[in-house]
Amino acid sequence: MKKNLLIVAVVTGLVMMGNSTKAQMKIGYVSLQELIPTMPEYRKADTALNDYQTALQQNFEDMRREYAEKDSLLSSKDTVKFTRAQIEIKRREVGELLIKLQGWNQQAQQLYQQKQQDLIAPIQKKAVDAIQAVAKENGYTYVLNKETLLVSPPAEDMLPLVKKKLGIK
């Protein structure tokens, strides 16, 4: 009898503890894809990235123009003015420029991605820090990224609270 009473007491305690844990859990979600573009820092970074991309494109155009000029010089009748050694040097220069041009797209893409990472990483960190602060202030147990959810339990959208924390209207 005492054994049965003890089992009932333990089971009742576990059930009560499980219910109180569920009652204390507060879930929220936020969309980083919606939050980050609304931040003033993002607009500045986006402008800087556009300027950087324009500079990279201009650099490519300058290299392409230089290649076209040197290549056309070798193709023209003016090559009779040059010695064989000079022609060979110019051909080598044209070949090097062609190789540089062919690799430029990949190099420019890597440069752009690095610049993007350098500019966006601090903005993402600021957003995540604000989300963590709002979660702590409002007693959220879990905060989920809205974009990664297919199915989720009922939760509160924290985006307005985070925007308020960041001073975004």
Report residues per predicted region:
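Amphipathic, charged alpha-helical segments and their helix-to-coil junctions
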Residues: 24-169
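Short, flexible, glycine/charge-rich loop motifs used to bind or transfer phosphoryl groups or to couple energy/partner
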Residues: 16-17, 133
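Positively charged n-region of N-terminal signal peptides that target proteins for export
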Residues: 1-5
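Sec/Tat signal peptide C-region and signal peptidase I cleavage site
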Residues: 17-23
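Bacterial N-terminal signal peptides
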Residues: 8-16
